[in-house]
């Protein structure tokens, strides 16, 4: 008799992990505290309840990274995608879901599976023995959150987090921006050019501050705390404290020389920092924001060099429990200090329903393969799944790690494909064609593991 796999949390990730492992012949127990113990966001005791929007975003598997993730999950027999397709609503090129029947159907399928048992229990500590997947999401209960913090180090668990925007490097106008660290600090050329700089003159700065103060902001939701962490003040809050505050904070112009206009001293400078090992994504340093998405794009595109910016992720501030996965997890999503424990879903630092379910799919398959004595390698980075797991388990910068949606900036570059806006369609098709072939190859290895 094979070892039982225990899964804590019956959200998107936990539900998908359970399904994948059970389909491989492994006995699974899902520990879901709801409805006995509720949260301020959940309304039912159903598994895979959608508490935010009802959108799985774009379903285009040729030109969109999340659409590719849909394709990979469907190819892997994913329960979440099967039920989303069964309860899809008209939404153009997106996949929107009728959330209540969706959750009811996922719950029914899991309860009906002969290899799955669902227990309405709250897990309040990290188990010392057995194979476990922790998939408790951003609303992890207090006792378990404390146990995770004690095991990983308090600084590894964020309870309320600020997010700065991330954009694609190839959308930045380098005739206006330049690469330089303040005062040319660093021992290597890479260190001395670690930051990308966008200069503003006085008029541009004043117009930017006016737009920032006037922009529509998102208010805190009920149940969220309105306090800010030190060092994570939203830029609009700083601007409200004085028009010069940003110019003496994240936008200070000191220690920098614009090679495009070496004799002109900038009034303010916006800095961007590389956000992934590939150098395809950059985040705007110190630009945590509560501006609504539409206003955010409009205001940030006022920055010289970012007029045509394309965003991989927009900024925001919200409650989010997640671990610093790049320092804590191996490429099997196991905790370095406790290899019997895997983490999956939003708690690992992925953002979104689909990404959470995708990490559950991988965790379930890897855990099941390990139990069956045929361990699986992580999927290739060329796949959407592989790009995500690589990002959260080592590709991202640990010091600035923040939740991330899947996007093509996480994928290794293609050879011989034109860059920039004009080559985008060909480039994205190249990414998705390459990913599909690599994913099919990895699924073949998984099938052998289950035999």
From Swiss-Prot:
It comes from the Bacteria. InterPro entries: FAD/NAD-bd_sf (IPR036188), MnmG-rel (IPR002218), MnmG-rel_CS (IPR020595), MnmG_N (IPR040131), TrmFO (IPR004417). SUPFAM superfamilies: FAD/NAD(P)-binding domain. It is found in: Cytoplasm. It catalyses: uridine(54) in tRNA + (6R)-5,10-methylene-5,6,7,8-tetrahydrofolate + NADH + H(+) = 5-methyluridine(54) in tRNA + (6S)-5,6,7,8-tetrahydrofolate + NAD(+); uridine(54) in tRNA + (6R)-5,10-methylene-5,6,7,8-tetrahydrofolate + NADPH + H(+) = 5-methyluridine(54) in tRNA + (6S)-5,6,7,8-tetrahydrofolate + NADP(+). GO terms for molecular function: flavin adenine dinucleotide binding; tRNA (uracil(54)-C5)-methyltransferase activity, 5,10-methylenetetrahydrofolate-dependent. GO terms for cellular component: cytosol. Its EC number is 2.1.1.74. One of its GO terms (biological process) is tRNA methylation. Catalyzes the folate-dependent formation of 5-methyl-uridine at position 54 (M-5-U54) in all tRNAs. This is Methylenetetrahydrofolate--tRNA-(uracil-5-)-methyltransferase TrmFO. It comes from Dinoroseobacter shibae (strain DSM 16493 / NCIMB 14021 / DFL 12).
